[in-house]
């Protein structure tokens, strides 16, 4: 019988697209630290020897963008010329415009307030920064309620970075990728890890044998629980044979090109909007966080084994145009009642999300590598499960 396999990938903080994400979010954090009401849409391109920062920003803060860019690159580990990219001497170009006044007006004065339909509710005043659809997801495959393939992929990449930064493996360089294939049983429960792929940038002098031995013994076997590994698990370590040239010298990087790595590894649907470089009035980011918060609390409350949440917005309108809950038949109550409970327990207007999750803070750079969801190494407000009792109470009182 054909195996039921599912694969997800992660990339390291030194991957060129992730370098761009971290620069964009470092700039966002610097703005929010000085002016919590900053409106930021910051994009970054990185390529050999050069960084280009552009976008639309409206803020009362002054931020030395070039300094933020260089410090971010150096912190990642691109700190010497032989890596092909060096934060000390790369060119940094900046082209920032103000946010469109048309968009700003729609965000600051929602349709509800313009049509006097807000009942003087201050949380009605902010409209969504754009139209769009966003998804959130949670599943009981891991303690952090994430799909197992993406969870393991992120953990592998964090482990590789740790071994590089603490100098256990002096020959590691910043760029790396991991991919994990998990076999599932007929009920959709994980059985074992079928294949692990790790491609990691290294110095030229290290042998393929040493790389393989280190990745298997110090990374894979330290990260993946033994119950998921057996004699049939396949390990593919630097399968291209050589990975010395990497980072922005090997490939150009651009903000927002790793949206599946950032979320659920393809296990759940994605609305298409990227996160990094966007302030929380952009629902691409804040509503995706809220959707994860909703889904995680539903699963944590024992109301479903898995849950996918879709939210949708119209530009300049405060209230979501739609809310959808899909538990794929695993819910203990029907999805319509769960949707009703969500409407009553969670405030999913942009200003409501910002208040509920306290999003006008400089907390975003830490999300720009190794995933925005299921993080156990940093404290993120949308990962809290503090709404479980409110959901259970609503269900109990309305069944």
From Swiss-Prot:
Transmembrane segments: none
PANTHER family, per database record: S-ADENOSYLMETHIONINE SYNTHETASE
Molecular function in Gene Ontology: ATP binding; magnesium ion binding; methionine adenosyltransferase activity
Quaternary structure note: Homotetramer; dimer of dimers.
Manner of cofactor binding, per the entry note: Binds 2 divalent ions per subunit.
GO CC terms, sorted: cytoplasm
Naturally occurring in which organism (per UniProt): Lactobacillus acidophilus (strain ATCC 700396 / NCK56 / N2 / NCFM)
Region (Flexible loop) location: 99-109
Chief subcellular location: cytoplasm
Top-level taxon: Bacteria
Record bears the keyword Magnesium: yes
Residues involved in L-methionine binding: 56, 99, 251, 282
Cofactor or coenzyme needed: Mg(2+); K(+)
Record: residues binding Mg(2+): 17
InterPro entries linked to this entry: ADOMET_SYNTHASE_CS (IPR022631), S-AdoMet_synt_C (IPR022630), S-AdoMet_synt_central (IPR022629), S-AdoMet_synt_N (IPR022628), S-AdoMet_synthetase (IPR002133), S-AdoMet_synthetase_sfam (IPR022636)
Catalytic activity: L-methionine + ATP + H2O = S-adenosyl-L-methionine + phosphate + diphosphate
CDD domains: S-AdoMet_synt
EC annotation from Swiss-Prot or TrEMBL: 2.5.1.6
Protein name: S-adenosylmethionine synthase
Pathways per UniProt: Amino-acid biosynthesis; S-adenosyl-L-methionine biosynthesis; S-adenosyl-L-methionine from L-methionine: step 1/1
Family, similarity comment: Belongs to the AdoMet synthase family.
Positions that bind K(+): 43
């Amino acid at each position: 019988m054909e195996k039921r396999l599912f694969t997800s990938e992660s990339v390291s903080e030194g991957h060129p697209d992730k370098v761009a994400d971290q620069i964009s979010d470092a700039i966002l954090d610097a703005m929010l630290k000085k002016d919590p009401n900053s409106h930021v849409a910051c994009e970054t391109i990185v390529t050999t020897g050069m960084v280009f920062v552009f976008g639309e920003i409206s803020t009362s803060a002054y931020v030395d963008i070039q300094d933020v860019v260089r410090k971010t690159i150096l912190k990642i580990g691109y700190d010497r010329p032989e890596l092909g990219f060096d934060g000390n001497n790369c060119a940094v170009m900046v082209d920032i415009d103000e946010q469109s006044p048309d968009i700003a007006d729609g965000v600051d004065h929602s349709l509800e307030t313009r049509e006097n339909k807000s009942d003087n509710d201050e949380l009605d005043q902010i409209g969504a920064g754009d139209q769009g659809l966003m998804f959130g997801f949670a599943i009981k495959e891991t303690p952090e309620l994430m799909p197992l393939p993406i969870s393991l992929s992120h953990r592998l990449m964090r482990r590789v970075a740790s071994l590089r930064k603490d100098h256990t493996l002096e020959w590691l360089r910043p760029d790396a990728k991991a991919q994990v294939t998990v076999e599932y049983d007929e009920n959709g429960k994980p059985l074992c890890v079928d294949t692990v792929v790790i491609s990691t940038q290294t110095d030229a002098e290290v042998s393929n044998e040493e790389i393989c031995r280190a990745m298997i013994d110090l990374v894979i076997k330290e990260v993946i629980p033994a119950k998921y590994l057996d004699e049939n698990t396949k390990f593919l370590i630097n399968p291209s044979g050589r990975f010395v040239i990497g980072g922005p010298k090997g490939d150009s990087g651009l903000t927002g090109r790793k949206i599946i790595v950032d979320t659920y590894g393809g296990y759940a649907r994605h609305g298409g909007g990227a996160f990094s470089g966007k302030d929380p009035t952009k629902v691409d980011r804040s509503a995706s966080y809220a959707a994860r918060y909703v889904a995680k609390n539903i699963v944590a409350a024992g109301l479903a084994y898995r849950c996918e949440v879709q939210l949708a917005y119209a530009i300049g309108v405060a209230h979501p145009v739609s809310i959808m809950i899909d538990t794929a038949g695993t819910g203990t109550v029907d999805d319509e009642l769960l949707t009703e409970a969500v409407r009553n327990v969670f405030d999913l207007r942009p200003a409501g999300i910002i208040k509920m999750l306290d999003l006008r803070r400089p907390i975003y750079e830490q999300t720009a590598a190794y995933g925005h969801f299921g993080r156990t190494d940093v404290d993120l407000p949308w990962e809290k499960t503090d709404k479980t009792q409110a959901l259970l109470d609503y269900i109990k009182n309305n069944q």
